[in-house]
Amino acid sequence: MKTGKYRYVVALLLFIAGAINYMDRAALGVVAPIINKQLGLSPSQLGVVFSSFFFGYSIFAFVGGQLADKYGPRRVFSWAMGTWSILCGLTAAATGFGTLLISRALFGFGEGPMNSTTNRTITNWFPRHETATMVGFTFSGQTVGSAIAGPVVGLIAIAYGWRTSFLIIAALGLTWIVAWRMFATDKPAQSARVGAAEREMVEASRSAAHPAEGGDESTPLRSYLFRPSTLALGVGLFAVNYTLFVFISWMPSYFTNALHLDMQHMSILSAVPWACGGIGYFGGGLLADACFKRMSNKLLARKLSATVPLALSGLALLGVSMVDSVIPAVLLVASAVLFLTASSQACWATMHELVPGRHLGGVSGFVHLMSNISGIVGPTMMGLAVQYFGGYSSGFVLGAAVDLVGVLAMLLVIGRRGAARTDETQTTAA
């Protein structure tokens, strides 16, 4: 029986939102070589500026998830996109270290609800067996945005100045809000464009996924936040995001300073790793859902889909630390990003196996907060490594070590004890 496909329109809007989100976020890293010269920033100062974004971002990742649970993702996403687009445009007014630091910190507040609200939307709109694929597809928009940021923002900055580039990409976000308000609703049942068969299929899938939820109404959100499995998943996503955020912030500077590329070639080559990241998100999602369908232990299927690529990304980072020529370095960075994004979407899909749907936004926001502390730590650590501890290579080795910690946390801790429910098909603990 045909069930309709309108839910994929919502997925496309989430994909575009992710692309805009990461284009906005990556823009500063792309123009950093120019800003360094104009504003006279040291590597350690630049690292602090990159990290300042994540102070506000981490806090509102948690708050945004709770708001999405309470007020619905349609309203929260509209507010978030409008706020971060305006604040991104205000980055163009920065005149020195202090004003740049403040503008990036405020910008982070606006972007904070992005991933937890996306996760809430996927829970509302998609059946359980499509979770990893849709997380992978929508999150792949983030790497598309990062890939576009290199050539587009870089070339705009060369032609019209770096301040103009921030104003242009801010306008894109404000335009997206119009489409989101026109075509998206909080749930399929609220949309006149969704047929009865599609709506019933999604609702039946989610009801079957949480058989104990109706009898668990009194369980408060906080009981899910500090379970070992929730904390271990947060550590795993911390490891994933640590290097991704280092690359978003420092890859352009690494390409220009360590690999000696000019601005034009850097802008073009920086798109390669993020294109591979898009493949990792979407391809990893397809593979993760294939494992999910084939394996009887559903939680183990999600764990393996998250930990194997994270371990491979650590090996790629060690390789990056050992090379100093352009082609091997770009290929190894691209491999690391591919494996990291494949692991990322599997981590978010694992969340759906640990938490009832009614608490998913809040718990996702909490895990998102944990994981995005890496954005405060990672860029600053790379800046210190460049200035004081032997350059970029030592920073990449540290990233590989963080990956290892994430792999061990998820493999050894996530299991039946921290699950919010026991699925009928999940017969053994991983």
Predicted regions and their residues:
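Residue-level signature of mid-helix packing/kink "hotspots" within the transmembrane helices
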Residues: 26, 54-62, 112, 146-147, ...
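Helix-loop-helix hairpin linking two adjacent transmembrane segments in secondary transporters
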Residues: 138, 142-189
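C-terminal transmembrane helical hairpin of 12-TM major facilitator-type secondary transporters
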Residues: 299-347
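Cytoplasmic helix-loop-helix junction between adjacent transmembrane helices
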Residues: 103-141
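Conserved MFS/SLC helix-loop-helix module at the cytosolic interface between two early adjacent transmembrane helices
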Residues: 59-98
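Extracytoplasmic
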Residues: 9-43, 247-252
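Helix-breaking motifs and short loop linkers at transmembrane-helix boundaries and internal kinks
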Residues: 40, 72, 93-99, 110, ...
